[in-house]
Amino acid sequence: MSRLHATILTVFPEMFPGTLGHSLAGQALQKNIWSYDVINIRDFGLTKHKNVDDEAYGGGDGLIMRPDVLGNAIDHALSLNPRAKIYYPSPRGKVFTQGFAKEILRDIQLNSESFRQDEFKEEPAEHIIIREQRRMPQNSLVSSLLNDAVNMIFLCGRYEGIDERVIEEYNITEISVGDYILSGGEIPTLTILDCLIRLLPGVLMNQNTLASESFEKDGEFEGGLECGLYTRPEVWYNRKVPSVLLSGNHKLINEWKKEQSLMITKLRRPELLKDLRDKERS
């Protein structure tokens, strides 16, 4: 059984696995470290044309994905993965970060044991899922986003977006990948999954690599940006590798890397330093 399973609802099923079928994610897919299935929303469309959208109440440009169509597609997905939490890539959502990704995977791991214990409770598991999935308060903390899910469902919106009632009825968590607009939710879904997959045990050859990457608050750069990287040749277009990296003095090298990380972070992402100071004060 894979460690992470994603069910993807989309009107463009041919977009998956896409880039996730290559490189590290592709190898992990072949090893069954993660798995996925795709549900074509148009299979639940209306009329012979399989329509999935309609005009917006209240006017405005663009078409809205219908709640009846999406509801049927979601119900089908939940029948296959009843413990899944539903995610909707949206510019209104909480911004997806490295820390957010780690929280999601940690919650999956911590709650996998409780899933098995649920099987021994007298209350039918299906009843439990409906109550927790659809009636959980909308203001739940990020740390509880995946409290009930080993499986994930991604709802990929198109056109102007989806009917708000779908989000309310299924208690869908909206996730943003940044302050910009894309044509649909497929690319954000690929981005989110790629980040999650590479954090799974067995995907990276050396799991310690994660500690030396940008945004890792417990890592080498303490949540800042990674320093510049260098490899052979030693001189390229009259540009030399910094001499400290050739010295063999690991103490000096580590100090240089941290100084460079601090300088780059202060210049390009100063808010990350504020987050670090806030963490130290708490």
Curated annotation (Swiss-Prot):
Q: Can you list the GO cellular component terms from the UniProt entry?
A: cytosol
Catalytic activity annotation: guanosine(37) in tRNA + S-adenosyl-L-methionine = N(1)-methylguanosine(37) in tRNA + S-adenosyl-L-homocysteine + H(+)
Q: What domain of life is recorded for the organism?
A: Bacteria
Q: Which GO terms describe its biological process?
A: tRNA N1-guanine methylation
Q: Which InterPro entries match?
A: Alpha/beta_knot_MTases, RPE3, tRNA_m1G_MeTrfase_C_sf, tRNA_m1G_MeTrfase_TrmD, tRNA_m1G_MTases_N, tRNA_MeTrfase_TRMD/TRM10
Q: Does the keyword tRNA processing apply?
A: yes
Localized where?
Cytoplasm
Main role?
Specifically methylates guanosine-37 in various tRNAs.
User: Which Gene3D superfamilies does the record match to this protein?
Assistant: 3.40.1280.10, tRNA(m1g37)methyltransferase, domain 2
Protein family: Belongs to the RNA methyltransferase TrmD family.
Q: Which organism is it from?
A: Rickettsia bellii (strain RML369-C)
NCBIfam families, sorted: RPE3
Subunit composition and interactions? Homodimer.
What name appears for this protein in its UniProt entry?
tRNA (guanine-N(1)-)-methyltransferase
Residues that, per the record, bind S-adenosyl-L-methionine: 157, 177-182
One of the entry's Gene Ontology molecular-function terms is: tRNA (guanine(37)-N1)-methyltransferase activity
Q: What class of enzyme is it?
A: transferase
**Chief location category:** cytoplasm
